[in-house]
Amino acid sequence: MAVVLSVIIPVLNKADTIVGEVENWLESGVAGEVIVADGGSIDATADLARVAGAGVVTALRGRGSQMAAGAKTAVGDWLLFIHADTRLEPGWQMVTERFMADAANRFCAGHYRFVLDDTSPEARRLERMVAWRCQTFGLPYGDQGLLISNEFYEHLGGFPSIPLMEDVALVRRIAKHRLKALPADALTSAVRYHRDGYILRPARNLLCLGLYFLGVRPAFLVLLYTRGRE
């Protein structure tokens, strides 16, 4: 029996790009379904996603809540959670199919290599830092994608409904020895780093991560994370 992959994308006001994203996933030959988890868009994101062929669910704003809602409706044996501003580069299909076909990965999860669509030295330095973080601490973030069997996801209890650090919370439950780095690139938009800076944004992310590990509530962390932004 063929393995079915459900791609789950949390979105908010992505009407300008959602059609192309959905079509790319559906045309990949790997995704059996695409689920757009909308966090209350005030534009035409949801309607356009449906027209493009995606299933659409609505949820409270926040990637944790949105991805959890998407997973509840997924019919796939495997789930791929991935951010709307991330796309997987050529070669990911074979890598993903091999991972899903290996019975040893039934209770494991995979993530892809973090790559920015920026040719600057600062971008390359950040990519190396992310690779080190993943290798040393087993902490991939959501913009690297998370490939996990539906069974294992349910066993872990899924994404928590928290406004920040939902990806960290889940991968900590997966545990480092069950996380595998997949040899395919996840190309992510560098817009956030151009806006916030290649020093300030990673520093703020690291501060939030450290405070989270110290027990600070995500409801407070999200205020720190979004400070100074609209």
Stretches found by the model and what they are:
Residues 58-74:
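Glycine-rich, basic loop-to-helix element that forms the pyrophosphate-binding segment
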Residues 4-6, 33, 169:
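Cell-envelope/extracellular polymer assembly enzymes that use nucleotide-activated donors
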Residues 16-20, 43-52, 91:
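Acidic helix N-cap motif at the loop->helix transition within catalytic regions
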Residues 8, 13-27:
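Short, well-formed alpha-helical segments that are part of the catalytic scaffolds
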Residues 91-122:
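Conserved donor NDP-sugar-binding/catalytic core segment of glycosyltransferases
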Residues 172-230:
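Hydrophobic helical membrane-anchoring modules
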Residues 79:
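Short aromatic/hydrophobic "clamp" motif used to bind/position activated sugar donors
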Residues 38-46, 86:
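A conserved acidic beta->alpha catalytic loop
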